[in-house]
Amino acid sequence: MAPQTSNLWLLLVVMMVMSQGCCQHWSYGLSPGGKRDLDSLSDTLGDIIERFPHADSPCSVLGCAEEPPFPKMYRMKGFIGSGTDRDNGHRTYKK
């Protein structure tokens, strides 16, 4: 029974690979063989830019302030760490 099951799985895998390998996928603006028309590509990029005029900077899209969030996290980590060190009796001395 084991050889029949393994043969069935092998047949299914081969059929799946063959079905994906024999298909031709078409996309908007693509010619057969994967050759692209460069004029339509620039038009497509222009359309994308026109649809998102507010996306000039990452902060305008994400709504963040001028300062990235990473320094804030490190300052918060240092603040929390210094508080827990004091609670445990540790002191930090600056030179």
UniProtKB/Swiss-Prot annotation:
Subcellular location: Secreted
Protein name per Swiss-Prot or TrEMBL: Progonadoliberin-1
GO molecular function: gonadotropin hormone-releasing hormone activity; gonadotropin-releasing hormone receptor binding
Superkingdom classification of source: Eukaryota
Keyword set, alphabetical order: Amidation, Cleavage on pair of basic residues, Hormone, Pyrrolidone carboxylic acid, Secreted, Signal
Gene symbol of the encoding locus: gnrh1
Family membership noted in the UniProt record: Belongs to the GnRH family.
Function: Stimulates the secretion of gonadotropins.
Keyword match Repressor: no
